[in-house]
Amino acid sequence: YQLEFRENLLDGVFEEFYPEGTAKKVVNYQKGLLHGDFFEFSKEGELLLSGTYFQGEKSGDWFVYRSDGSLKSEYTYQNNVLNGFSIAYYASGQVAERIPFQMGEINGIYESFFPDGGPKQRVVFVDGQEQGEFTQFHADGKLAIVANFSKGILEGIWEDYDDQGRLLSKGMYQQGDRVGEWKEVYPAVSEFYQK
């Protein structure tokens, strides 16, 4: 450890080391509060985490890295609360998911992606709950599920498709429960009777 004090409070750069002597953390303090750049490293010296503190709270962009140095995820903070997009990446660098935050709650369009960049899921969040149309896709881009949410609860139409685009099931949800008549198709049975 290397510490600096001013008026009995941590002030300046704080460094923590692994037993082998390589840097583990480099942190800035001002009047006893985390303030400024923050870095965390692996034993091998690779950057694992970086961000900024402002008067003891996470602020601005934070980055998480894999041991190979590639970006794993990034977050934006305001007053120690997620605010902005949180983005996760595949090792290839392709976006895996994008989550919109407003003052700590998911708000906006949530999207996830397959490793090739094709869409995987898409849904709108309002005040931390799914709201409106939800879509999920197969890896080849074909539609897998279409559903609807109201305040985080399944409400309305539900359609489920196989990877050939054939309808598997269709029905309605009301306050999270299946209601009414549901159509369910079993492609293997249908193909057998068509031969």
Q: Where do the PLM segments sit?
A:
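Glycine/tyrosine- and acidic-biased, solvent-exposed loop/turn segments at the edges of beta-strands
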Residues: 1-195
